[in-house]
């Protein structure tokens, strides 16, 4: 069983699980996370270092940092213009169930219902087999899900490339202030995670898989980090029946961003959506089946496809919860 210890950083005491790290640049094994961050050891193969700054383990490779510079600049401009985040600590405590800012209440209503469904109907199935669980929170944002999981005594690790103090990993300080054992914050990309193989029980894509530029590569990397029998969970990524429906959505959004912000927000060729044929192909690639859960988001959400059909608009996305199951579980 993993344990934790107290590591001093600029932001105070940070409790880290005993995890093995590998270099995000060359994949060479580095050793224990606590030793690597305490001593800022360089990779013996390529010289890359994973350091701890403001309580965040900086594990984005140099080439990754360069690749995402423009994306992060544009993404941050959009998010700040939309009024994401808050200076009020209470805002973060209310997530995902309430948006105290009132600026994105409908979006958080969906996020809240997705997580409520996951927490009440899906997570207990995993907890019967093992608890606490070691969990990758992929696309953790401000860390709200890791906080909720930590309250259930699990061991989450929050992963994101956005470290913004209002909207990214930097905002997790509000959650850390209330926890005796703080969950680790790791700046890293999905396709090059700094963890050795087989250390986690769940890999949860937290409204984030659609940011992947290559689903095969991203899901293969998540599976690498999982123990035998570990599960991939996909929350709040848009799913369309047909590919062309998602492509129409993407074209609409690019036009909207160009008009509103002066750029299309496509510097990174993210996939942006899933569709049913792609899910089938990804299941074959991974050697799994997707168990599909469909939370109830209310009548307004339920009637969206009918309204779209009557008005001649493209079919809207669906937000399913997808959980990977090995094919052996169906025999």
Task: Describe the residue ranges of each PLM region.
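Short, low-complexity, charge-dense intrinsically disordered segments
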Residues: 327-331
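Conserved class I S-adenosyl-L-methionine
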Residues: 54, 58-129, 148, 233-257
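N-terminal auxiliary segments of SAM/dcSAM-dependent transferases
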Residues: 2-86
